[in-house]
């Protein structure tokens, strides 16, 4: 990121009061910018109103006159800073203008708190889209020396665009690569660097978007990258752009987003799903994320190095939840559910006959039949077994490769019993079939790829390559 977003000071205006602020490690401290005690007290009174408990953006500028926006999610806390009264809040999102001079603002075609495109780049995005796809190496001879020259491919060779919809808003999703200049070396000012390549995913919109939409677009992209990298602790940079009168994008702001991750991991490209392999299905994947159908992945995927090396009972519970959801992605569940509906019809018929022969008993009101009847369905072990049978060839390869127990109804039952024991009694005992976690984790991914429309052969290639 080209600008400091972790610690700085400046002024912001909240309603009709001006405050000096200091940002340090996500915490914004506010001091009323007035000398008179009465004015300072009146300024702080603004935080007592009910409206201040609602999420909002506070706008101002830093000491170098860059415009600033802090996102406030909850109430502002009041206290003391030395002898002065102050207020504090934690911000999960900071937006800072990309320029601070009149020339910068003259190029904006909308108010500064609007954008036509949001770009996510670097970090784990470089894992799912290798930036070296944009270059090729040419070997040549220079006199007596053999040299290798780097040349950039044509833009069309490493750029792809598709249509997606997020929150009811249509956008163009573009995946490509850009070159960033390297920072100057203070120890050798005359040195020359080629800079660095970063892959990016950009969402661009026909109509300008408000800052309030940043969180939704970021969350969608974060889950997308997490799914493809198979880990939740992903990272990348974010900036905003406006479209100028020549239909070119002009960088308008940088974003700093605090996601709560304790550590970040960059991936071995052999363990990730390349976005290029499923690019045609990205609109379907984005739709599933936007609908909330894939939120379980936030719990299921590892969040740090420790999670990569161990399995907890919470992981087992989350995996069972994910498998329950995956069952409803499957085409077979409709066939199975039809069986359940026919069973319910038969039960209703039997109850009707029973009541006719026993008029003094009302099963619906005098027994727990209604509640049992409402939850009539296949057991989780049967649902998982259905999914396994649909993906048997792939999952057997993964189980054999990793030396785990064979997947069958018996071992699935033993695995589900771990979840049930913890959920219902708080007591569970690890057994050999806990090792079933990895092939069943793989099964969730196979089901997801099928769900978003990846063909069977490509699913097999992806699963056997990255798991």
Give the ranges of each region predicted by the language model.
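Intrinsically disordered, low-complexity N-terminal regions enriched in serine/proline/glycine
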Residues: 3, 7-10, 33, 70, ...
């Amino acid at each position: 990121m080209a600008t400091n977003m972790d610690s700085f000071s400046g002024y912001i205006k909240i309603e009709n009061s001006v405050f000096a602020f200091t940002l340090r490690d996500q915490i914004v401290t506010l001091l009323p910018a007035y000398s008179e005690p009465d004015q300072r007290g009146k300024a702080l009174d603004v935080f007592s109103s009910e409206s201040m408990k609602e999420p909002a953006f506070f706008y101002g500028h830093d000491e170098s006159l860059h415009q600033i926006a802090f996102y406030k999610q909850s109430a502002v806390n009041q206290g003391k800073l030395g002898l002065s009264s102050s207020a504090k809040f934690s911000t999960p999102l900071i937006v800072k203008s990309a320029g601070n001079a009149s020339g910068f603002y003259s190029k904006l075609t909308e108010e500064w708190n609007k954008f036509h495109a949001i770009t996510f780049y670097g970090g784990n995005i470089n894992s799912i889209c290798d930036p070296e796809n944009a270059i090729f190496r040419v070997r040549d001879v220079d006199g007596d020396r053999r040299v290798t020259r780097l040349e950039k491919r044509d833009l069309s060779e490493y750029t792809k665009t598709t249509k997606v919809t997020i929150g009811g808003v249509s956008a163009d999703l573009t995946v490509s690569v850009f070159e960033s200049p390297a920072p100057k070396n203070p120890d050798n000012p005359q040195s020359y660097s080629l800079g660095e390549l970063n892959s990016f995913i950009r969402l661009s919109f026909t109509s300008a978007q408000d800052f309030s939409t940043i969180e939704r677009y970021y969350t969608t992209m974060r889950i997308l990258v997490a799914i493809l990298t198979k880990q939740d602790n992903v990272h990348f940079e974010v900036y905003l752009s406006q479209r100028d009168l020549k239909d070119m994008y002009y960088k308008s702001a940088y974003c700093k987003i605090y996601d709560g991750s304790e550590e970040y991991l960059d991936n071995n490209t052999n363990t990730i799903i390349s976005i290029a392999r499923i690019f045609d299905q990205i609109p379907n994947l984005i739709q599933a994320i936007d609908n909330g159908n894939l939120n379980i992945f936030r719990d299921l995927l590892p969040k740090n190095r420790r999670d990569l090396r161990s399995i907890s009972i919470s992981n087992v519970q989350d995996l069972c939840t994910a498998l329950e959801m995956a069952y409803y992605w499957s085409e077979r569940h409709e066939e199975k559910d039809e069986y359940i509906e026919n069973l319910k019809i038969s039960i209703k018929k039997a109850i009707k006959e029973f009541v006719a022969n026993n008029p003094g008993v009302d099963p619906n009101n005098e027994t727990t039949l209604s509640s049992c009847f409402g939850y009539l369905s296949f057991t989780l072990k049967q649902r998982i077994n259905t999914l396994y049978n649909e993906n048997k060839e792939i999952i057997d390869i993964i189980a054999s490769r990793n030396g785990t127990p064979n997947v069958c109804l018996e071992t699935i039952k033993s695995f589900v019993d771990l979840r049930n024991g913890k959920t219902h009694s708080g007591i569970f005992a690890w057994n050999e079939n806990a090792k079933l976690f990895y092939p069943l984790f793989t099964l969730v991914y196979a089901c997801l790829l099928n769900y978003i429309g990846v063909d069977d052969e490509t699913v097999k290639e992806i699963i056997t390559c990255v798991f």
